Amino acid sequence: MKRRLLLLFSAALGVASAEANDNPFGCSGDACAAKHGEFELQQSVAMRRGLDLGTGFDAGYRGYDLATQLEIGLSEISHVDLILSSGVLRSADFRGSFIEGFAVEYKRLIGVAAPDQWNAAWAGAFGYSRVDAASGEERTETSYVGRLFLQRDFGTRSQWVYVTNLSTGLVHDAEGTCGVLEWSQGLAYRADDHWSFGVEAVAEGCWTRFCTLANSSLCVGPCVSYRMTDFSIVCTHLWQVSGSPSTDDGRNLRDTSRSETRLLVAWGF
């Protein structure tokens, strides 16, 4: 349930500029910011796979998560993101499309980005959601998220890039307030000026009353990206390799599904 919060903010993160997004990852944002007066429009689609469990805890619901994002450069080291999330759900109780909610995020570099060294950025976001993506039911949920981005390019003679993100947040709904934590990592190799290949890992957890672990999971999978001057596309596929608790009457407890494919398309202007 709470995992949707972090996916909302990580679905389309990257560098926004007159050129296309050069972040080779679909789940991890890089330590870059849009330049003043420049924009980027991004559309992400996450296709979920899993068992249709019907009523009850529907952790294996199937469908699509969509996020439309506009990045607006405010200065040389900061930008703001406007995000609209929607979805398509196929379950025993709900079949159809819906507008889930929106989010506003501010991102700022820590220092000046430079090659051959660690680069960092931070972001703060507010989100509002009116539909539960796991069930299609209407409800009101507000969220507050903080994110830290670290990026390392391994020199001008190396084509490797490493990114890690740490996200923490609070989610409040009719059931109360819970804490969420997500840690993502990505390692990619830039084969040429257009193609990149890599692997990503996403670990996440949700705590009720800030002290009781409700669920956690670890997902790993490959990613591939293609970039042109003003266009880029990234595809990532994740499999759940572990989770806690692992079963509930034989059912998987990951909030979305045991397998998902995420596609991110970006245009710079």
Where are these predicted regions, by residue range?
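Cleavable N-terminal export/targeting peptides
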Residues: 1-27
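Transmembrane beta-barrel domains of Gram-negative outer membranes and organellar outer membranes
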Residues: 19-173, 178-184, 188-269
